[in-house]
């Protein structure tokens, strides 16, 4: 069974078609070509499905980095 962090990482890997070694606290919106507005909505959709949550619009907008995402997803009761 995957941990929540593995599920979180897999959402990025699946949404952006990137390798896990690209992930880290410095990855953020528009820091890689794949994380544009279309990629952002894909990521949000995958995260909502994987964690069975529905994010508020403010949280979708504030989801600006890999690191910030942990905080935002945590607001919905997901523990990392």
Protein language model regions, located:
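Phosphopantetheine-dependent thiolation modules in NRPS/PKS and related acyl-activating systems
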Residues: 2-35, 39-45, 50-80
């Amino acid at each position: 069974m995957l941990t929540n962090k593995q599920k979180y990482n897999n959402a990025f890997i699946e949404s952006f078609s990137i390798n896990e070694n690209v992930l880290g606290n410095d990855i953020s919106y528009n820091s890689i070509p794949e994380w544009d507005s279309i990629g952002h909505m894909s990521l949000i959709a995958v995260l909502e499905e994987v964690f069975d949550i529905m994010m508020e619009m403010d949280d979708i907008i504030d989801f600006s980095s890999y690191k910030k995402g942990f905080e935002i997803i945590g607001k919905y009761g997901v523990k990392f």
